[in-house]
Every structure is written in structure tokens, then in C-alpha cells.
């Protein structure tokens, strides 16, 4: 059984981390490099940077940041937010990111998935899916969770795999930010429907939540606030998982 991955998420705006971060002994909680190094030293497996500025003029700030991160940290990192073209994807990889993710652009132009996968390789392409239960099915949302699309998230996940995505980053809008646990029914439905790795996201509040989501077959789990606020360190979380029989990297 492959080691399960713990992934930290950082929201970036104008090259700075946003969302409250209360780490002790960090001089500048807004500096992505400093936070990334902190996570790396704690044993994080991967880091995801979501660029929420994502306006065209600001893209250079993001590209410069990608270069700096690549120089300073060794754990794999993924970059996304506003990527709409094959060229943008290639440039981010060229600057040193290990993977990129797309979301809205994939829904609006599904052939982009295949084009990017053909160019940079499926292993380097993650498709992010934001979903919310609408009473009948889990509906796909785009534009940062603002726009419902009328599409079934489980069916979309299958299509994304067929088109060449190497991984799915699945966020439940119902549990996101609640700290009450991951959305187990949604995550299980997607995990059971596809053969590519699924990263569960939205709702992590304590180590038991990670255990739950790994037990239903998630390959990785992503969290932000649980780590940002220093409630649990990555190492504490991994020790807990290892004790409970989940394979994790502990070096």
C-alpha cells in the first residue's frame, strides 16, 4: 500500500499568503516561502498554492513566486488558480512547479485537460473539482465556488480521468471550513468511480478526520487551517495515522 499523503494548502494573493495564519515563531506569516519551509521541516508531503489574484497582469508575480519556491523547498508543489491555457500551464511547470491544477477552465473547455496532459504529462496535471450536494446529486461549481454548473461531480470525475488528468483534487463545499470532518459520502463516491488518485479537501479539523478519509480510499488529504493555526503539527498527525495502521512517510 502506497504511503498516504498529507498536503497543505496556501491561498496566494499578489504573491502573499492570505487567510489567517497564527504560527508562532514565524516572522512574516504572509510570506509563502517561509510558510512552505515551515511545513517542509514538519514533514509535509506536498504543498498546493492556489493563486486567488489570478488576474492576467498579476501573473508575473505568481511566476516569480513559483521560481522562488522551487529554489527554496524540496517537497513537491502544485500551483493553480486562473490557469486557462496550455501556455500558462507549461510556463508554471517550466518555472519549477511539480504539478499544476485547473478547475473552471476544465469545465468550460474539457479538451484543455487532454491538451495540457499531452504537453506536460498526466502525472503533472491535477483537475480540481468543487462540489455541493443539491438534494439529488453532488453538483459541480466553478469560479471559486460561486457558479453552479448543473453537472454531476461523480460523472465529471470519470470524464476528467478519461481526458487524461493524473489526479483529482476534490473539495466539498458542504464541509469546507467547518472543521467537522471531510465529506465522506462524496469522497467515497468519487474514489470508487475513478482509478486515479483522489485528494480529499474540505472539513479537516482533527487527526481522526484524516483517518476516516484514508480508510475509504483517499490517496491524499489536504488541509489549511488545521496546520496554519498550529493546532496540530504535520508530524503529530502522521504519528497518529501510523499508529492507526495508515502508511505514511515519517522521515
Swiss-Prot record:
InterPro entries: Aldolase_TIM, His_biosynth, HisF, IGPS_HisA/HisF, RibuloseP-bd_barrel. Pathway: Amino-acid biosynthesis; L-histidine biosynthesis; L-histidine from 5-phospho-alpha-D-ribose 1-diphosphate: step 5/9. It catalyses: 5-[(5-phospho-1-deoxy-D-ribulos-1-ylimino)methylamino]-1-(5-phospho-beta-D-ribosyl)imidazole-4-carboxamide + L-glutamine = D-erythro-1-(imidazol-4-yl)glycerol 3-phosphate + 5-amino-1-(5-phospho-beta-D-ribosyl)imidazole-4-carboxamide + L-glutamate + H(+). It is found in: Cytoplasm. The active site is at residues 11, 130. GO terms for cellular component: cytoplasm. It holds the Pfam family His_biosynth. GO terms for molecular function: imidazoleglycerol-phosphate synthase activity; lyase activity. Its main location: cytoplasm. Its EC number is 4.3.2.10. Belongs to the HisA/HisF family. IGPS catalyzes the conversion of PRFAR and glutamine to IGP, AICAR and glutamate. The HisF subunit catalyzes the cyclization activity that produces IGP and AICAR from PRFAR using the ammonia provided by the HisH subunit. NCBIfam families: hisF. This is Imidazole glycerol phosphate synthase subunit HisF. It comes from Pyrococcus furiosus (strain ATCC 43587 / DSM 3638 / JCM 8422 / Vc1). The lineage of its organism: Archaea, Methanobacteriati, Methanobacteriota, Thermococci, Thermococcales. The gene is hisF.
